Amino acid sequence: MEAPRAKKIEEKLIKDGDVRIDEYFWLNQREDQKVIDYLNAENQYTNEMMKDTELLQKKLYHEIKSKIKEDDESVPFKFNGYWYISRYETGGEYPIHTRKKENLNEKEEVMFNVNEMAKGHSFYNLAGVNISENNQLAAFGIDTVSRRIYTIRIKDLNTGKLLSDKLENTTGGSVWAADNKTLFYTRKDETLRAFQIWKHKLGTDQSMDQLVFEEKDDTFDTFVFKTKSRKYIVIGSSSTVSDEYRFTAADHPDDDFKIIQPRERNLEYSIEHYGNDFYILTNKDKATNFKLMRTPVEKTEKNNWTDVIAHRPEVFIENFEIFNDFLVLEERFEGLTRINIRNWDGKTDYFLPFKEDVYSAGIGRNPEFDTDILRIGYTSMTTPNSVIDFNMKYKTSEVKKEQEVLGNFNKDDYETKRIWATARDGVKVPVSIVYRKDLKFGPDTPLLQYGYGSYGVNMDVYFSIPRLSLLDRGFIYAIAHIRGGQELGRPWYEDGKLLNKKNTFNDFVDISNYLIENHYTSAKHLYAMGGSAGGLLMGAVMNQAPELYNGIVAQVPFVDVLTTMLDDSIPLTTGEYDEWGNPNEKEYYDYMKSYSPYDNIEKKDYPNLLVTTGLHDSQVQYWEPAKWVAKLRDLKTDHHLLLLKTNMDAGHGGASGRFESLKETALEYSFIFKLEGIKN
């Protein structure tokens, strides 16, 4: 079957005298039948080219699914007199959310059976479940399109009936005031930016709602939450480099909101309330890796803030949790998370002990102050996800749950370690790898290298059931902790954004070279994968070093950087000027143009490539991957596979059911196995 060829229609994109010719610009017309026809033709071609893997895809799907415990439930947590539990039943794609009053022996109360709610929808997402103070009402958000636009409904938990209230065009989240009849929520504008906080009174039409706050700066997003103490409702507004918060008492929802500290560029802070103070995690006073401060509720401006935990250049504070007797810090040191426990009198100061060399740990859900029990999450590439309750007073721990892996899984069959590759500028970059203990490394060993490297998002190690299907077929799996993430602290992020963005791509390529030079694999057997901004990474490394990879999987890739960042009518653009740069300024325009994958396709050989996207994707518009594939097909000089798979129903996150998404994984793995000559 011949590959589809998209029609060329020349579009001149002119910016300050610079002319770019985009022959596939027309693909951004979602309503044009010719666009739909082209996407369908690409899907048909992908299906045809992958036809010889259909049995393998089915096998992989069932292999992965058979390891997942179908009737599974979360560890209960207690909040405001009720225990909350989510569970899955055999055959169910979606969770069932339940609760029990006071103790776990009480009768179960089903709040939401999402399997029932999702009937008749190809995509369904329930989000932002929020229970009123009197425990009688639940507000929740629903998205049935995967555009991340939610309608909020309210359910009476006594009768099981939905109230008539219907709040459209929201983020899905909401906050109840103490009166059980006032609800605060966030609305989105046409670019899907969260820009307004509204106040809704129960039983009234949305047209009667009151606008409480509007964020007029389009580089900021706004949100609303309630403090852990449940005493204050807080409106936050954040950009990439600054924050601003305002608050009002939860039992006085009609009072004006008072600002905590007006926004200043490069002043970042977040807040929590305890006792008579707000506790503030901030980079104030050049605290690059953040410090913890506090200020009285009556005097919140920054000149009143005092240090609780001073800044330490080598330790990055990511999160904190307050208890009556203890302060808990989630920190990052030398690329690994650690949990520091201190009591308020200063006599106790210790770290939770973790046995593995490479792991990921984080503070879990801890809604109560008056307890000595800290709940954390723990995982590694060989240890399934675990929920642990740690007694901070007696230093004892109880594993409440370790994710069950069915079949003959034995974690002792696998090994994980961290290695350090030296980048071209001399910086050492950590890489986490996992493999079967009986695997021998060499030039014929297949290796899948994964990366992201943007927004300060950490690619921490985690356990994955699907990944076992790679490892058990002789693969090494590597996570590249490249610059642009925050694994080694805030400077690691700063060194991989704006005019340092190319460090992200260079790190990934240099890690690939390191893995080849040190005989973990060879270019014939090296594969790369990344999604969204990690898809940009895939496009950039493919342009820079196509000879290093046998195959690449680019999931919902952000590949037309310049055109997207010049279009402030589409989601995320203006809010991301502090991540990529503002292309209306020549220095940033030129720099982005020099690495944007779509603008740098050349007549040369490229690796085998599978590209995935969703027609309704709001984060990376479908036309970016579509245009990229069309242009690659026209210019590339090789006979390698080039496949585009568009999910015509889903958005950025792919399919919504827990098993449906495994079919996407099965396709991606089958693509790699096909290239590797693995048939089962």
Give the residues covered by each predicted segment:
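Beta-propeller folds
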Residues: 1-373, 377-385, 389-393, 410, ...
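Extracellular/periplasmic catalytic domains that process cell-envelope and extracellular macromolecules
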Residues: 18-19, 103-104, 470-471, 602-605, ...
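Short beta-turn/strand-loop junction motif enriched in small, turn-promoting residues
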Residues: 83, 88, 116, 143, ...
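Short hydrophobic segments within beta-strands
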Residues: 86, 281, 330, 377, ...
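Glycine-rich His-Gly loop
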Residues: 88, 283, 379, 450-454, ...
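Cap/lid segment of the alpha/beta-hydrolase catalytic domain
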Residues: 115-129, 140-147, 161, 390-396, ...
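Active-site lining segments that contact anionic ligands and/or coordinate catalytic metals
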Residues: 221, 230, 242, 266-268, ...
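Active-site-proximal cap/loop segments of hydrolase catalytic domains
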Residues: 479-680
